[in-house]
Amino acid sequence: MKEKIISEINLDLVFQCNDFSQFSNKLKDSKTKLIFESIFWEKVFLSWINTILKKEDYELPYYIFEKKSFSLGLQIISNQEIASLNKKWMQKNGPTDVLSFPIISDESLNNLDQIELGDIFISLEMALEQSYEYKHSIYREMIWLASHGFLHLLGWEHNNEHDLENMLNFQEYLITRLN
C-alpha cells in the first residue's frame, strides 16, 4: 500500500461511561482501567484515522480524505441501555455488543470544517462476556468492538461473508497499528 504524508489531524471525541463499579473486581489492572478514560480513546481513534489517511487504496468515502478534523461520540453503557437502543433503532430484541449510528452524508459536508462521523455505543457487560468466551482481555475486546463500530461510522458494512471477512481483517489491521 502506498503511504501519504498527512498534516495534523484534529479529533473532537465526546466520551461517556456509566458507573460500572459493580465490575471493579474484574477491571483491576492498569491497562484495563484505560478503557474508562477519554484521553485513551482519543489516542486510539486518532491512530486509526491517521492509519487510514496514510493509505491511498482503501475504499472509503471521499470526504474522509478531504478533511482533517473529525468528531465522534463513544459511550460505554449497560446491557439494558444497549438493548433499548437495539429495539428502538434496529428493531431487534435483547442486548448486543456494539451499535454504531453514522450521521455523515455527502450533502452535509459542503461548508463543514469538521466531519461529524456519528456515535458508537458499547455494552461493557457484553464485552466482559465475550472476552471470557474468546479467552482474551476486556481491553482487547473493547478495542475490537470500538474498531468495529468505527468502521461502520466510515461506511463499512458486512451484508455477506466476504464483506464481513474484509471488515474483520481491517479491524485487526487497525488494532495492530496501535502504539
UniProtKB/Swiss-Prot annotation:
Cofactor annotation remark: Binds 1 zinc ion.
Q: Which GO terms describe its molecular function?
A: metalloendopeptidase activity; RNA endonuclease activity; zinc ion binding
One Pfam annotation, family name? Answer: YbeY
What domain of life is recorded for the organism? Bacteria
GO BP annotations of the record are:
rRNA processing
Subcellular location per UniProt equals: Cytoplasm
Asked if the record carries the keyword rRNA processing, the reply is: yes
Enzyme nomenclature, EC number: 3.1.-.-
Coiled-coil residues are: none
Q: What is this protein called?
A: Endoribonuclease YbeY
Q: Which organism is it from?
A: Prochlorococcus marinus (strain MIT 9312)
- Gene symbol of the encoding locus: ybeY
